[in-house]
């Protein structure tokens, strides 16, 4: 049997990030063959990940990737078991790598990387979801990760002129839009983007609430309720967090100030755990 040295174990740990005893056992099992030991560890990692795959992953982070030209942003929700691991540097690096990989290819197969990281960190890790937004015209992708990386936001904002994107009012607008989405949690960009079945259900609820009113008054009351509903769930209809006017009116005011057209085209908001069932 080949003698396993401390130097070999240290080198294998550096290459794989696996634990000391795991590296020693891998080298022993493969008689000092480093490549075979790496493969042995990968197989062990996969087995370890399988054992841990049923553990609850209620913690985690939202990771962000923005391309160098600022034209494509990607959000990823990655869940783990404990907040301690969510704050771990190795886990954070892993999350950033996953976000970059999904930016390149939204359908990327990252299972091997996930199982290897499960073995290294010692907790169940799940790549829960990812989404990207991009622009192929003048404008910018606004991004924001809230403190603790529990909420992440993307928004695409189009302009008529490229030079608008370099102005301070526009940059401030991007920041304000992401803060609005973070704080107010809109469900849709505008009225056209709302789920029409859900909208009709809101109308039915309102009609039931006021069924004892005169018939001619019911529809006016219902439409008033729906207008209020729009102001709560549609981003452009929401009250802007920094003023009394709506988000739509605030964007229009900035556009007028800059002599350009500015339009919010789409947004994504991820919050850790919001897709998990109780």
Residue positions per predicted region:
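N-terminal assembly/interaction segments in proteins that build large macromolecular machines
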Residues: 2-278
